[in-house]
């Protein structure tokens, strides 16, 4: 009976203990939202990591629960990059969690070895980091540049010998980037390559060993107490190699080789990092004897794979997003011709400050950080409040670089997309803000030491590849990623061909100038654009609109395009064309029309919408606003045919200069009925306006407030003249520009210094292959200088192959693109931009033929 009592008491005690333990776990962070299981166990974290898609699970959790989410009984994940300084301060006090304990390489005879990146003890970390930190400064790294140059030469030799002339047989470009990164680090560290490039394979199984290490520690890091049983256990080590053992064997081999002559008092002339490590240890009694081993291990583990990761990210995205590839190649060619950039051995001095290369590197670091689980820290005494959430002392807290780097409040709604331009044209403060929001290299006291080495290698490699080879990606759908702490990519297959060398100076005069960066704010929102051709035709006198005159081009019969812009159930019209009863316009306007032009087939846009027999179903009653590009008769249509609830939007100065209208003002060119009973909104491009921004050289206004549709200040042709820019696709972005009457012939815009005459059109005699055929005539513009500036601004837009430019009276587009009720959102996929850009040369050919 006594035994039964003891058993019962013991059972009750165990139950009470477990209940208290579970309650403490739950209550410890009870105010932090998260999935139910996370309050009691870390097993779901293990599953997330084991799946290889932990970053996706993390993102879903934050989407559901907010910026602070409980991932485990004592672990909280934060997604807001604005909290980086609080969690990763420059001062001591936020040690790394036991997640990093599992990353210490282990051997049975020497135990677990701390290194700079995995040490939890902050005093030990300081003792390991401080002696070698100067070696990783850019000043010192540049002294080792010749080691990288040697490896670049071997890479070129191997690519030329193995893959050129191979009948476009695909090869694993991703693996060769990794071979280059490892052999570069080998030369930097040991003055010798591992042999990856020469052999074209994983030497000594190092790559496989590192990936095995990552897959093991990523899981163990979620339940670090289990590591002592499964990995750092002398008994287990009898049956399998512990994590990091293979890499340590390579490290020990090279160190022993380097120490041998030193033990014989032989002088070594090696200038690599291992020599510097050994010199530091030999000259500083406070440095632990095993420190060079730890430093070298870090170089191999963290310094090579992560660099290769960024290289793969850059090349994949450049090859998929060919517009960014072209832009970077243009920048490199410009630097080659003007600054002496070498194709085979570019110096750091020549590549360090190339703006678009820099933007591509930053975008790769942002989009695909090499390490992709939360960087865990332990909250010190006194606790921490982040995201309005209090975390008591002892709580494990961390931010994943994947979450911080894709924060949409910081990087824009297109934070998931490749867009290097987001880094260009920023103020110093905005650029710093974005850079400080990146967690790729860590932050605070534990920022990655090898950052400068990685940047130097990357900025030297990418120009070499792009200047020497035409590279095409093969089956991009096979490109995959797997997250095992290290965010690995596979499947980057490509074919290469030798790129023809442009002789320096031979084509500079014909070489296009890079247009200014447009700095269109990122957005994931788009509009549908439908171009309405009402069938109305106007006869234009060229001398009123452009100069010089061509004897055979005395008259141009032009259409009048209008635009239906839709986002969801919201619909606006940009311009209305010529009203059907145009003879009811003010007498002075009617007289001008009859003396200078003829109008064929005028139609009201409201009638076109209301008679549409397609399934579109957008009627005049659905239009929330009419936007006038300007107040001339061939654009204003008849607003009175729309409900009074339809707003009229006009450019700056229109309201005061055009109303009262006719008949109140006999000299007016607009009618009172245009606005009678209707709300008129006159937009302003003043920077004090909330939605006012700058796009390229244009002052702009975000019309819907979501980055899908902008009005641009296209001044000069008349008072209040505006254009519009619509985002019609994302991933990648493409746009439609509606130019109104900024000019009336594409020859006013093309060729340009950004867009020279194509070779197939050079049989037409031109004064210059990089200057427009025509210039604006000064006859009609209300402000000729402003009109010329607007044309220059449009030329900048026109130079981008993701902007489709439509002038209101461009006859070359008729029959060469889709019109209402179809959208033109797929204009780029259908090739409208390339197919129509130079069709205006037909006018010139016809004009010259007519003079013969």
Swiss-Prot record:
Pfam family, one: Lactamase_B
Enzyme class: oxidoreductase
Highest taxon of the lineage: Eukaryota
Chain positions recorded as heme binding sites: 448
Keyword list, A-Z: Endoplasmic reticulum, Heme, Iron, Membrane, Metal-binding, Monooxygenase, Oxidoreductase, Transmembrane, Transmembrane helix
Co-factor requirement: heme
Disruption phenotype annotation: Results in dramatic reduction in MPA production and leads to the accumulation of 5-MOA.
Localization per Swiss-Prot or TrEMBL: Endoplasmic reticulum membrane
GO biological process, one term: mycophenolic acid biosynthetic process
UniProt cross-references to PANTHER family, sorted A to Z: CYTOCHROME P450 (PTHR24305), CYTOCHROME P450 MONOOXYGENASE PKFB (PTHR24305:SF175)
Family as reported in the entry's similarity comment: Belongs to the cytochrome P450 family.
Listed name of the protein: Cytochrome P450 monooxygenase mpaDE
Native source organism of the sequence: Penicillium roqueforti (strain FM164)
Organism lineage: Eukaryota, Fungi, Dikarya, Ascomycota, Pezizomycotina
């Amino acid at each position: 009976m006594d035994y039964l009592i003891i058993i019962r008491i013991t059972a009750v005690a165990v139950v009470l203990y477990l209940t208290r333990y579970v309650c403490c776990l739950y209550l410890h962070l009870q105010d932090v939202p998260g999935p139910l299981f996370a309050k009691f166990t870390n097993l779901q974290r293990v599953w997330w990591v084991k799946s290889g898609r932990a970053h996706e699970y993390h993102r879903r959790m934050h989407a559901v629960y907010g910026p602070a989410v409980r991932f485990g009984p004592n672990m909280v994940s934060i997604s807001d990059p604005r909290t980086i300084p609080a969690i990763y301060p420059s001062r001591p006090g936020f040690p790394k969690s036991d997640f990093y304990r599992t990353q210490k390489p282990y051997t049975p005879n020497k135990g677990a070895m701390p290194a700079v990146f995995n040490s939890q003890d902050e005093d030990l970390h300081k003792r390991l980091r401080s002696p070698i930190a100067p070696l990783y400064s850019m000043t010192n790294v540049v002294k080792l540049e010749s080691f990288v140059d040697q490896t670049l030469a071997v890479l070129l030799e191997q690519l030329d010998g193995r893959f050129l002339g191979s009948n476009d047989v695909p090869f694993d470009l991703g693996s060769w980037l990794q071979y280059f990164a490892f052999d570069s680090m080998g030369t930097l560290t040991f003055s010798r390559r591992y042999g990856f490039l020469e052999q074209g394979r994983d030497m000594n199984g190092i790559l496989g060993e590192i990936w095995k290490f990552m897959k093991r520690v990523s899981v163990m890091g979620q339940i670090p107490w289990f590591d002592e049983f499964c990995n750092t256990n002398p008994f287990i080590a009898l049956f399998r190699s512990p994590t990091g053992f293979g890499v340590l064997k390579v490290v020990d081999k090279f160190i022993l080789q380097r120490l041998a002559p030193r033990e014989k008092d032989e002088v070594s002339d090696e200038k690599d990092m291992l020599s510097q490590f050994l010199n530091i240890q030999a000259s500083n009694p406070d440095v632990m004897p095993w420190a060079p081993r730890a430093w070298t291990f870090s170089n191999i583990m963290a310094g090579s794979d992560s660099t290769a990761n960024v290289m793969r990210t850059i090349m994949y995205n450049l090859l998929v997003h060919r517009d960014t590839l072209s832009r970077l190649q243009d920048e490199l060619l410009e630097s080659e011709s003007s600054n002496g950039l070498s194709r085979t051995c570019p110096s750091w001095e020549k590549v360090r400050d190339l703006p678009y290369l820099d933007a591509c590197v930053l975008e790769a670091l942002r989009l695909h950080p090499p390490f992709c689980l939360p960087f865990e820290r332990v909250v010190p005494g006194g606790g921490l409040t982040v995201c309005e959430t209090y975390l008591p002392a002892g709580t494990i807290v961390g931010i994943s670089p994947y979450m911080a780097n894709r924060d949409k409040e910081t990087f824009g709604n297109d934070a998931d997309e490749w867009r290097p331009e987001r880094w260009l044209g920023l103020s110093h403060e905005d650029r710093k803000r974005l850079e400080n929001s990146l967690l790729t290299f860590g932050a605070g006291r534990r920022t990655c030491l090898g950052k400068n080495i990685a940047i130097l290698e990357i900025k030297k490699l990418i120009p070499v590849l792009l200047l020497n080879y035409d590279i095409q990606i093969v089956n991009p759908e096979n490109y995959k990623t797997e997250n095992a702490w290290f965010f690995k990519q596979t499947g980057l297959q490509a074919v290469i061909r030798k790129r023809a060398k442009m002789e320096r100076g031979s084509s500079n005069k014909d070489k296009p100038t890079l247009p200014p960066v447009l700095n269109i704010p990122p957005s994931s929102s788009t509009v549908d654009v439908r171009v309405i051709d009402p069938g109305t035709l106007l006869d234009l006198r060229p001398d009123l609109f452009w100069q010089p005159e061509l004897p055979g081009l005395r008259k141009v019969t032009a259409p009048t395009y209008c635009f239906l812009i839709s986002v969801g159930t919201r619909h606006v019209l940009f311009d209305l064309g010529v009203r059907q009863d145009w003879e009811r316009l003010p007498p002075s306007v009617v007289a001008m029309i009859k003396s200078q032009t003829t109008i064929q087939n005028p139609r009201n846009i409201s009638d076109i919408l209301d008679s549409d027999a397609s399934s579109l179903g957008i009627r005049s009653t659905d239009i929330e606003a009419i936007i006038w590009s300007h107040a001339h008769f061939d654009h204003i249509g008849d607003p009175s045919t729309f409900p009074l609830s339809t707003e009229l939007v006009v450019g700056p100065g229109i309201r005061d200069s055009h109303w009262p209208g006719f008949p109140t003002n006999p000299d007016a060119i607009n009618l009172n009925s245009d606005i009678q009973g209707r709300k008129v909104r006159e937009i302003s491009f003043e920077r004090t306006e909330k939605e006012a921004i700058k796009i390229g050289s244009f002052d702009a206004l975000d019309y819907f407030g979501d980055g899908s549709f902008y009005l641009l200040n296209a001044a000069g042709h008349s008072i209040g003249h505006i254009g519009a820019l619509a985002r019609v696709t994302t991933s990648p972005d493409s746009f439609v520009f509606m130019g109104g009457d900024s000019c009336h012939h594409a020859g006013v815009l093309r060729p340009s210094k950004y867009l020279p005459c194509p070779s197939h059109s050079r049989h037409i005699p031109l004064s210059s292959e990089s200057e427009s055929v025509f210039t604006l005539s000064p006859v009609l513009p209300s402000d000729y200088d402003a009109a010329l500036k607007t044309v220059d601004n449009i030329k900048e837009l026109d130079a981008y192959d993701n902007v489709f430019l439509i002038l209101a009276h461009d006859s070359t587009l008729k029959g060469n693109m889709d019109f209402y009720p179809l959208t033109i959102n797929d204009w780029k996929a259908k090739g409208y931009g390339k197919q129509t850009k130079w069709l205006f040369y037909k006018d010139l050919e016809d004009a010259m033929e007519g003079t013969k």
